[in-house]
């Protein structure tokens, strides 16, 4: 995808919890120029804010029940092509599409011809021939989503590809932070755990640094990606040091399916050094929030008493924000093909 031209300057950047309507932006191409959403890396701070502001509206419409009567995507077909197992993300995209009135078709890895030896390019050509109006893809290989996006005629949304990116997770996390803390800039945010294998961590680092936060990576050396300084983060191997003064503590699960035993000796030792306990959380600010993208390994990276502390834990709120963010993304990316005025 060619690099988007710079957007016109706006001041200030819209990141506070009090948002203007998403309609109060320059029309169409001046607001959001992308055909696909393959990663946070393609977005500007202003474009991230644009999506978050649109999602804010969907949060309130979902809570009031009004979103169930929305039909702006009526007549459109969305294919959720998940080549990796998923519960939260798949259900979230399915609910998002249906609340917007679209016909939603879920394709699971076990049902796909990939299991029979079909190449990813052939799968992309097959999906394109079915004339879907949008395709949501999760795949175990980094870059698979971009490969498919290059072969199809409709918008493609990345629901997670290998270790690469998970953009809607980062967007929903940013929205959760903004609603809880009133802003999503100028904060100290500690991302803790298996950062090496985490596409969630990568997308969050990209988004949160772009929005002007101090991002810290807290992990064993064996689970810290190389050259992290290029991503403008501070790295800590000591959990207590990494949590000092943090506004946000984001925990990540150990992705055992993507690692071998060489990365850490045991789950018990990992919990002793990197598990988030009430005592360890005291190192962060008194009003710090605790996040986790799920699924959680209780008693490994996070204690149940911390995960279930609703005053500080945002875990269920993140799930709610996920539906709103994905509704916003589906709406925005299909505006051109729906002929929305200003989105030519």
From Swiss-Prot:
GO MF term list: amino acid binding; aspartate carbamoyltransferase activity
Source domain of life: Bacteria
EC number assigned by the record: 2.1.3.2
Region annotation (Disordered) ranges: 1-30
InterPro entries linked to this entry: Asp/Orn_carbamoyltranf_P-bd, Asp/Orn_carbamoylTrfase, Asp/Orn_carbamoylTrfase_sf, Asp_carbamoyltransf, Asp_carbamoyltransf_Asp/Orn-bd
Pathway(s) annotated for this protein in UniProt: Pyrimidine metabolism; UMP biosynthesis via de novo pathway; (S)-dihydroorotate from bicarbonate: step 2/3
GO BP: any one term: 'de novo' UMP biosynthetic process
UniProtKB keywords: Pyrimidine biosynthesis, Transferase
Entry GO terms, CC: cytosol
Role: Catalyzes the condensation of carbamoyl phosphate and aspartate to form carbamoyl aspartate and inorganic phosphate, the committed step in the de novo pyrimidine nucleotide biosynthesis pathway.
Listed name of the protein: Aspartate carbamoyltransferase catalytic subunit
Species in which this protein is naturally found: Sphingopyxis alaskensis (strain DSM 13593 / LMG 18877 / RB2256)
């Amino acid at each position: 995808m060619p690099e988007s031209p710079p957007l016109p300057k706006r001041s200030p950047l819209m990141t506070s919890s009090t948002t203007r309507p998403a309609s109060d932006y320059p029309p169409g191409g001046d607001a959001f120029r992308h055909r696909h959403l393959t990663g946070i890396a393609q977005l500007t701070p202003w474009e991230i804010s644009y999506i978050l502001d649109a999602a804010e509206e969907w949060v309130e419409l979902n809570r009031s029940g009004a979103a169930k009567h929305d039909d702006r995507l009526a007549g459109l077909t969305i294919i959720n092509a998940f080549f990796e197992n998923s519960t939260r993300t798949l259900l979230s995209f399915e609910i998002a599409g249906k609340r917007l009135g679209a016909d939603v078709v879920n394709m699971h890895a076990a049902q796909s011809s990939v299991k029979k030896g079909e190449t990813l390019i052939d799968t992309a050509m097959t999906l394109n021939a079915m004339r879907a109006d949008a395709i949501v893809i999760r795949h175990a290989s980094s870059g698979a989503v971009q490969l498919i996006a290059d072969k199809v005629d409709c918008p493609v949304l990345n629901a997670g590809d290998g270790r690469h990116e998970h953009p809607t997770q980062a967007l929903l996390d940013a929205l959760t932070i903004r609603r809880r803390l009133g802003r999503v800039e100028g904060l100290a945010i500690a991302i803790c755990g298996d950062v090496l294998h985490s596409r969630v961590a990568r997308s969050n680092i990209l988004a949160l640094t772009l929005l002007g936060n101090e991002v810290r990576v807290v992990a064993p050396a064996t689970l810290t990606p190389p050259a992290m300084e290029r991503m403008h983060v501070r790295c800590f191997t000591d959990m207590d040091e990494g949590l000092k003064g943090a506004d946000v503590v984001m925990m990540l699960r150990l992705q055992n399916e993507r690692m071998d035993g060489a990365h850490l000796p045991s789950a018990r030792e990992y919990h002793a050094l990197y598990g988030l306990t009430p005592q360890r959380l005291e190192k962060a600010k008194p009003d710090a929030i605790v996040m986790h993208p799920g699924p959680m390994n209780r008693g490994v990276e996070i204690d149940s008493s911390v995960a279930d502390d609703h005053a500080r834990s945002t875990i269920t709120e993140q799930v709610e924000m996920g539906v709103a963010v994905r509704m916003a993304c589906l709406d925005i990316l299909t505006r051109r093909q729906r002929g929305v005025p200003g989105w030519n």
